[in-house]
Regions:
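Short, solvent-exposed hinge/capping segments at secondary-structure junctions
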Residues: 31, 53-68
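Generic short beta-strand segments
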Residues: 1-6, 56, 75-79
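Peri-transmembrane interface segments
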Residues: 137, 141-186
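The feature marks short, hydrophobic/small-residue-biased sequence motifs that occur predominantly
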Residues: 5-45, 96
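Basic-flanked hydrophobic alpha-helices used for secretion and membrane insertion
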Residues: 52-53, 67-155
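A generic structural signal for short hydrophobic patches within well-formed alpha-helices
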Residues: 27, 57-58, 118
Length: 186
């Protein structure tokens, strides 16, 4: 996978998002189909790039994923800009074809696109920011983590699902305590 921050524009409404470029194997590794509210998890049809937006982000941008004529314009800083005459942003178009809902922070932030789409935006055909691995039932996550670290010689972060969600759980705990304090003070 490859994640990058981008600016989206849909019919004049704009918002910052995290683009998550995924390959064809993503459906097999995740339960993405179970969190789709509308549409199918298809990110490319021939030469046409498609996008699946988080429900919150789609709502903020007022996206109509059933309108085949309106595309999202996706802007990213041009990382290869050499001088003042070079374009400061790269731009690509993708058609919104569905919405997903996982949890609020994802729903208001993430957009799924094809890995090829985001690689063309960053102008790097081999760019990767993460690899997602599905373990077989009963596999020991810590042993798998150790084996991955032993295989890869460069320093990398290997996180299991609980470690990835730690920040979210910490935030939820803080919100719970703030709610408790507000109720206690009234």
């Amino acid at each position: 996978t490859l994640e990058e921050t981008a600016l989206l524009d849909y019919q004049g409404s704009q918002d910052i998002c995290t683009l998550k470029g995924v390959d064809d194997q993503f459906r097999k590794v995740t339960a993405i189909d179970s969190v789709l509210l509308d549409g199918d998890f298809v990110l490319q049809q021939g030469e046409v790039s498609l996008a699946i937006l988080g429900a919150g982000l789609a709502s903020r941008l007022n996206v109509n994923h059933q309108n085949p004529y309106e595309s999202l314009t996706v802007y990213m800083p041009n990382q290869n800009q050499r001088g003042p005459l070079d374009m400061p942003f790269t731009r690509q178009f993708a058609y919104p074809v569905g919405r997903f809902s996982i949890k609020q922070d994802y729903d208001y932030q993430y957009v799924f696109v094809s890995l090829a789409f985001i690689r063309s935006l960053v102008e790097s055909p081999d760019a990767v920011s993460g690899i997602e691995i599905k373990l077989t039932p009963g596999a020991d996550a810590e042993k798998v983590k150790e084996k991955i670290l032993a295989l890869i010689k460069t320093p990398v972060n290997v996180k299991n699902k609980d470690e990835q969600n730690a920040a979210f759980f910490k935030l939820m705990n803080i919100e719970k305590w703030i709610s408790f304090a507000v109720v206690s003070l009234t």
